[in-house]
Amino acid sequence: MPPYLYRLPTTSLITFSAILNDPSSSYTTILSDATASRTKLHLALKGIADNEPGASALAVLDAVQIYLPYLKGIIACLDADELLFKGEPTFQWRAPLTHFSFSSPLLPLASIHSEHLMVVLTYALALSNYAHSILASLPAFEIPAGPKAMPHMSSEDEKRTTAGLARAVDLLCQASGVAEWAAENVCLQVEPLKGVSSGRLGKGKWPAESSRETFKALSMILLADAHLTAIRKLLFPVLTYTLFAPPGPPLPPNHPSAPLQAKLYLYVHQLYSSARALLSVHQQPTSSAPSNSSRKLFRSNTDKDVIEPEAVEGEIIPELKRYLAKEAQLALALAHKWLGIDAGENGKGAKVGEALAWVKDAQGRLEDLEDSKMRAKLKGLSIGKSRERKKEERRARMGRVERELEVVKAWVKAYQKMNDTVAFQPVPPVSSLVTPSGRPIFGPKAFIPPPSKFSPSRIGHLNEEQGNDSPELGETEDTSYAGKGNYF
């Protein structure tokens, strides 16, 4: 169930006074504070990796909020030559989106800009994981598949669920905006470093996290997850009807528009598919590819084919590849379901054949996702996760497919009966039908970085010459900025 739960990066400890030279001795205290703030981030990430009590994505977000202004100040002072590296700098990080055959190593990444990139990546992933934790804490409100107990919700649960869904959507939009900003800003500063020997993965290859395409894809994935969460919120008011009424026609009067839902799911499918295409850019060069089979995920294929991801050293982790493949397929199936319902319910009896074509196609796609052979192939691909967690995720994904398949079968049965007894219309092939374009309901939330905690002293001197009140040497004023305090 979206959003995807990411493994967060981890890093080693750094003492800035040990790697930076401060010729003017103006930044001794500030560098000590920067080291303390980075240590807090290190401990927050380590706590999650070690499953320590109290560790959470919220603690990581708090640590990033404190450290990022210090990091920006250090970068500004390095650019102004007021701070200098004592030697060749390396910042060790574990890359959570890059697959490794064995345990993920600490990669020595060159340049302070690599450090900046990994911190911003941590911020985006932690925002998504925080949204995931909010949704996981909500009462169960979707109908379970099969003859199981129906969820029961009090009015207090309904308020809490509505607020939780809205908050999760906002967090995911923030995360999407952070990833988009990183792709257009920080990644461009890391690109020239790709020829540097340190930080490489294999033969001249950096981790997937260093790629601009990866951040663009990540922004799309997070935005798609936000839309799916928004759709859940959109359908929440009709929960009572869906709990007690059998699936199939007619829709209740207060049900969200069928064409709107179809266009939303088409947009989600477009985002996931575009993300898959962008992630293929970071795959191994042909000369170093282990085999042609490792490229199957991104080869051209029919929409109904779900190509299984393979675990290839240095490429995107197979769990994320599989997530994109399945969510793209599921979104397209649900889009076709709602296109069929729109044709059947709003066509005044003139489009029963078209409605039947759409819902039958949706049924076929959902059955492909439910195929037991395909699930057996996927079983061993969740590397790095506990067995129980893999079972829970598979069970949750399976429940969604089963639930939707039951609903679609009811619509197919209803439209088939209507066509056989009343309409007598031919059922056209889906390829002959016009698919509308997808429709977004929001975009990424623009990310404006917080101001630096301190700045080069010569900027302060310039302010004095211009007659402005300048802050204390090496520090900046605590000005307001868009999104201030809205880190989590």
UniProtKB/Swiss-Prot annotation:
Pfam annotation, one family: BRO1
InterPro entries to which the protein is assigned, alphabetical: BRO1_dom (IPR004328), BRO1_sf (IPR038499), pH-resp_palC (IPR037505)
The protein's matches in CDD domains, at most eight in alphabetical order, are given as: BRO1_UmRIM23-like
Role according to the record: Required for the proteolytic cleavage of the transcription factor RIM101 in response to alkaline ambient pH.
Q: Does the keyword Zinc apply?
A: no
Family statement drawn from the similarity comment of this UniProt entry: Belongs to the palC family.
The entry's keywords? Coiled coil
State the residue spans of region: Disordered.
Answer: 449-488
Q: Where is the BRO1 domain?
A: 2-430
For this entry, the protein name equals pH-response regulator protein palC
